[in-house]
Amino acid sequence: MFPILKRREPKRAVGWGDELIIRPDTPLNAAQKKQLAKAIKRAKRDGKIAATAQQTIPYEEMYENGVCRLGNRLYSKSIAFEDRSYAEASDDDKAVIFELYCRLVNYFGPTVAFQLSVVCYYPDMAEYRKILRIPPTGDSFDPIRKEFSDMLLTKASLCKTERSLCLTFTVEAEDVKQAASRLEQIQADVLERFKGIGTQAHGMDGYERLLLLHHCLHLDEPQRFKFNWDSLVGTGLSSKDYIAPSSFLFKEGRYFRVGPSVGAVSFLQIQATKLYDTLLNALLNIESSQIVSIHAKALDQGAALKTVKRKLSDLDKAKIDEQKRAVRSGFDMDILPPDLVTFGKEAEKLLEDLQNHDEKMFMVTILLVHTAPTKQKLENIIYSVNGIANANNCNLIRLDYQQEQG
């Protein structure tokens, strides 16, 4: 059989030129550190990196083990996982997968906030050409190697966007050592649950998290990620210097600008009594660079029960007021407004789930970030997304004058 060369890992560079090729974990000598620091300063001076862009990136320090210090005694870690073939599964398999995901979500208590993120970004085709190219060896199998390489590249070019999925969880701790211990335990438990679902997952190290942040900040302009841990020592550089875009502008209330692209942040207002599993899939199938993030935090069980019971008491009071009004008007007191009856049944079911089925109540926010080269194209994308949301009894609400916070 003819030999097929193994897939080559792309070289990860530092600096802004191709003359300094160093892997992320390669120690740098003093001359290389000096060269790198000069490259960063030159990029800042030329406007390739903006100081305000770094201030917008919401973390203080990223560590090699994947722990990120967010500030205010908060620390986070992320798990990358593969997409499960849920849509093609049978109804019975879907029910099992859904139940397992529910158990995963219920694992998180009120002291741990978590965020499910799906990042869709345009691939760097120049990098793919380097990776997929099989160099000739001078034998008779070179035409086959070229044909195979071209086929792989053609298939890669058919993919409009790449998709990365990660689960990020956040805890409060006194210092990074205490945070790392807690986060490692949570990571081990979550990975075990992903294994039960049948989904491949692994804890992300600091480089992987920075790479994903780099994708988030360069959705429309694929750029090679150039980074080295040793370059942060004794140079005054920060990991933000390597992932920051050329600029962030939030002067317009309904838009923001990141580098050459224009973007918008919206949240999903849920009005439906039940959300179907097709909603997220439909949102992600939009051919656009985007970030869909689901932020959730469980309420304390005691507080959740009090909230539901208080709501039931308010509904009972409203029923009594309606019955009194009906009697005074000469109507049948047993005829109540449909909304009161519906809300009462839903509240009773929720209380039953909380008390007897070990369910939890979560505070959930769903944010969507879309970017495009022009405002017109961005508005077309948002119009399509809003149509999907409306079909599921939801509304897409723009975060006016809160784009940076979003």
What kind of feature is each model-predicted range?
Residues 2, 34, 38-41, 47-406:
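Extended, folded cores of ATP/NTP-driven motor/assembly subunits in large transport
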